[in-house]
Structure formats: structure tokens, C-alpha cells
Amino acid sequence: MDLLPNARSLKATSLAVLGAMAKLGFVVSEFNRDITYQMELLGKEHAAFLGAEVAHVLYVPGVYDMPIAARRLLRRDDVDAVVAIGCVIQGETAHDEVVVQHAARKLMDLSLEYDKPVALGISGPRMSRPDAHRRVDYAKRAVEAAIKLMKRLEGI
């Protein structure tokens, strides 16, 4: 019997400790809901795996609408970090690029203003619907990024 834990179990254990006591707020886009629903579930599942609590979930019509909801969550004392979950699919124009760039920029500004992490779990731009379905794990990565940054900023 091997008494030393393998690298996989060490990583899982250290990540679970990392998320302990973290309270997250989710902002979820309803546009492309078939995809963002999967992303939301995966994000919640990963937060629970890491020992974090999803304290609040706000639904917004689209990615462009995320900043105001993120601001409301960031104002709360019971939210340590915000995870933005959305999916922007390429159309006939550059609309997808404009939406993602402006939303990402404003979410970054809010993170700096409130001194709390805001992680992007937004797939796109320049993504087809099949591409977006393959990238639902962006939500999982965003949850992990929010928790890691929150923990690394503690005590500074």
C-alpha cells in the first residue's frame, strides 16, 4: 500500500482548502441559455468541490448587461468574488467582439473599484455554437481563478 498521496489527490485536497469559506456571486447571461445553463451548473459544482459557497446568482439578459449586476454583488459584504458566466456567439458582424470587449473591460474596472476579484467565464468572441458547447468548462476555470485570486490577495 502506497502511503504517499499522488499528485492528483494532493491537488484536489489543496484546492478544496483554497475554496474553504469563499462566498461567490454568479452573474449568468440568459442569452444562449442552453450553453450558459450548462456553464452555470458546472461552475456551481466546481465551487462546491472547492469548498466555496455560491451565495448569490443574478441572471441578466446578456453579457453586455453583466456589469451592473456584478456591481450589485460586489457591494455586498457576503460576496468575496464574482464569477461572470456567459456565451457570445459570432454573427454576421463584429458585434460579438464589441460586446465581449466592453463587458470584460467594465468588469475589470469594477474589480479594481471594489477590490474584489471578478473572473471571466465568458466564451467568445469569434466562436460558433458548437465551439461554445465545447467550452462550457470556462465557468469551471473562472470559479477556480476567482478563488485563487481572492486567497492570494488576502493579507496584502
What are these regions (language model features)?
Residues 1-21:
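Short N-terminal or domain-adjacent regulatory/targeting segments
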Residues 14-59:
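Glycine-rich phosphate/diphosphate-binding loop of Rossmann-like nucleotide-binding domains
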Residues 19, 34, 38, 42, ...:
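Conserved active-site and cofactor/substrate-binding residues in soluble primary-metabolism enzymes
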Residues 37-39, 67-71, 93-97, 130-134:
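Short, well-ordered secondary-structure micro-motifs
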Residues 55-64, 124:
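Short beta->alpha junction loops
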Residues 96-97, 101-156:
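C-terminal binding/interaction regions
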